Amino acid sequence: MSAKFIDKVKYFIGLDAFEDDNEDMLEEADGMDDEMIPISSTSKKNKILNIHTTTQMKVVIFEPSSFEEAPGIVDNLKNRKPVIINLENIEPDLAKKFFDFLNGAIYALDGNIQKVASGIFILAPNNVDISGNIKEELKNKGVFPWQK
């Protein structure tokens, strides 16, 4: 042990080349480097997200006949799908009940509702913007603007 200590001191001062027992192990390990396989590869791949993805939005059209269909309409709004609802062919009391229920749902979901015609409404979730007055657009341009 004292010989090892003296060898280390000589190496530290620079008088002697220090040989450690661990060098033998390192030489053996050098030969093994070629055969080493990593246990787990942690390659970080950059995820590329296209900002300009065009997702096709679907508009759901409902012509309800009973109030039991109201939760289904709200489910579509919760799934961020715009809904067109036609309340023309149901009783006025039921239509008012539908309108009040859907108006509350639109308010809770921070959406938008707009009247298109008598008894026909567009309900849009907060990710869909309804710009302009559709009723005025239909009066001015008609249903098919190219057929003026």
UniProtKB/Swiss-Prot annotation:
Entry-linked InterPro entries: Cell_div_SepF, Cell_div_SepF/SepF-rel, SepF-like_sf
Keyword Signal part of the UniProt annotation: no
Keyword terms of this UniProt record: Cell cycle, Cell division, Cytoplasm, Septation
Superkingdom of the organism of origin: Bacteria
Biological process annotations from GO: division septum assembly; FtsZ-dependent cytokinesis
Pfam families in alphabetical order: SepF
Subcellular location: Cytoplasm
Gene Ontology terms: cellular component: cytoplasm
Subunit structure: Homodimer. Interacts with FtsZ.
Family: Belongs to the SepF family.
Function field: Cell division protein that is part of the divisome complex and is recruited early to the Z-ring. Probably stimulates Z-ring formation, perhaps through the cross-linking of FtsZ protofilaments. Its function overlaps with FtsA.
Name the UniProt record assigns to this protein: Cell division protein SepF
Gene: sepF
